[in-house]
Amino acid sequence: MIETLTTLEKAALLSGKNVWESRDLPRHGVPSFFMADGPHGVRKQVGSGDHLGLNASEPATCFPTSATVACSWDVELADAVGHALGREARALDVDVLLGPGLNLKRSPLGGRNFEYFSEDPYLSGKLAAAYVRGIQAEGVAATPKHYAANSQELRRMSSDSVVDERTLRELYLTAFEIVVREAAPRALMSSYNRVNGTYAHENHHLLTEILRGEWGFDGVVVSDWGGSNDPVAAIAAGANLEMPAPGLDSVRQLVEAVRDGRLDEADLTARAAEVLRLALDGRRTPRPEIDRDAHHDLARRAAEESMVLLRNEDGILPLAPGTRVALIGDMADTPRYQGAGSSAVNPTRLSSPREALAGSGLQLTAFAQGYRRHSPVDHDLERDAVAAAADADVALLYLGLDEISESEGVDRRHIDLPDAQLSLLRAVAAANPNVVVVLSAGSVVDTGWVDQTHAVLHGYLSGQAGAEAAVRLLTGDATPSGKLAETYPLALTDTPTFGRFPAEGRTSVYREGLFVGYRHAEAAGRPVRYPFGHGLSYTTFSYSDLALTDDSAEFTVTNTGSVPGAEVAQLYVATPDSAVVRPEKELKGFAKISLAPGESQRVTIAFDRYTWRHFDPTTGAWMTEEGPRRVLIGASSTDLRLSGELHVSGVTLTPSVSPATLRTAMLRGLTDDEFNDLLGITVPRDVVTGDLRRNDPLGDLSRARSPLARFAHWVLITLRRRSEAKGEPDLNIQFLYNMPFRALGKMTGGMVSDEMVDGIVDLANGHHLRGLRTVIAGFFRNRRTARDLTRQLTEAR
């Protein structure tokens, strides 16, 4: 069909019709396809749409977030959740589900970490691939996001991620590579930010050379909402769809670029053909009936298999039937079960801990609120909680991060729990030492307070059935089997990006290179609170009889305890005396095994294309280094039970840079000169001065020359502070603060053209007459162009 389309029609396919739909071509029978957010639940909005989820959405199952399910280390579970997401999307006539998110967790301060899987690319990629396979098996296109090197929320639509090629390939692209190669997603979302100076949505190296050329991706690359910069450059680079609805200004630019020879029509045709295929493939699967009870049970099982038992002193858990329990904490009554932002789901139902305890066999002696969610210490509530704790066998305390602490649009300032909760914990522990904490947080928190507890069960953000899952684990109806998918440091100062995350200027320089998460902690010799892969159980497991072949590692895992349980066996690879800088070891495989008491199972973990390789930036290719490898098997990154060595065939390397020199520099944080001398990358000067530019965020209006623009900034900041003080993040304000001027032309449904954006920037810079003239002329030109192009498209029908 693509040959029958005019240049105008092909260009029209490459931008959205409205907030959630692609543009249709009725003359050719080309339908629009409907997109919806959905990393952990389908968010199809009722009525008019908005990207941030402020308007109500249809009820859907709220599954645990990706950060939670990552702790299950269970590919089959991720596949099952993906199937459920796909079925619910299909039932709501959603053709393209915008997820899963698999950005690497570079820092625990990332405001959106709750949406992402892990600090490790291999674990992230394997789980995300399972999600994608499940979603697409139900006839819905999955959209892994945000590609690539998108680590911070501050200035997220304009920041430039400066990262060396090896780090980019091995850490920030590998998860996407695994998903593309193993699950063949039909769509992929580019990120807002620049990567080494070029916006991700128009980055030829990322989109054409790597994504399409090396990995074989043949689907649709969609911009994040408002994330397109130059539509002509985007199509030339390998992107397809500009969202949400920039009107017909982008269509005009594409048609003119083809006519003027600035854009090869073959590129336009190829990109339009990919959008056309996605549109025609949609809605071929009948709408299924949804068993909401079954999906709720799946959400509970997902939470149950993902929660991590961090501490269990004196075997206080599981709690015996009849144990007298005081239930304490605002989150015990109103659970925190998902993050804020575009992924927020309207759950089909929601269980609370108070309700879940009712049929648990435990004796609930009292409930005490203990603290107010977004307020300082309330001594009256604290006294009531202390009295309740003193009169119980166990104080069951629900703590966690509040809604303002982690949200799309804003990064975290620290990793501490709120002061009111820490004060409550101290007071309750003084009254009753048998404190069991259930923790709710989508990312790393400082757990320096654990010595005041007997047990800590980390539920992450566990979805609509998380309260039921937690109670089943607390009472022994289920055995904890979750393992951390990220490192818990002793302090924020121990993390590799401390003091420079989030980057406040125009550039975010990845000075730590390869050393993120456990890779950094081990290489720097930093002790941690809880290592990557850590998680306790009510039973114990032994490992034995490691056998290595060229293709796999085989070993035996035995349940040596008295209750059934599941173990996550982890395979790491170390390269002794490597000629290139490397982490101490890296995760290269894992398996989750369920065993009855006394049962043994032989486990095989196959080696794959990711096991031995490293990226050589000099040749621009993946290499396998000749030499010995140590294969390490264990229950966490630090609890290693078995090891063996084998020789790997490959190439003998002669490094151009001393591994020791580069390692030292990365662990300390590469300077600008070292980036240039050791990695060949020139770090751009990061000076935010002078006139505002079209790609500067509205948060920079503080330095505008126009008093009116500075007043607008004051209003923006005032509204932002008020919402934060109430503990209710205003996502519109957060979005506007980080939104560049150019996005005004992408988020207003065609009301503002690129020419008008230039005029608005002139106005902010104090060039009032020129700016006003440009805005007025641009307004009439934009309206005339939209009318003419609409007429041409209508006549073509």
Q: Which residues does each PLM region occupy?
A:
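Glycoside hydrolase catalytic-domain context in secreted enzymes
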Residues: 1-613, 628-633, 637, 749-750, ...
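Polar/charged alpha-helical tracts
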Residues: 3, 256-259, 387, 619, ...
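Terminal connector regions
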Residues: 609-655
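Charged, amphipathic alpha-helical linkers/stalks
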Residues: 644-714
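Long, compositionally biased, glycine/small-hydrophobic-enriched stretches that function as flexible linkers
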Residues: 682-797
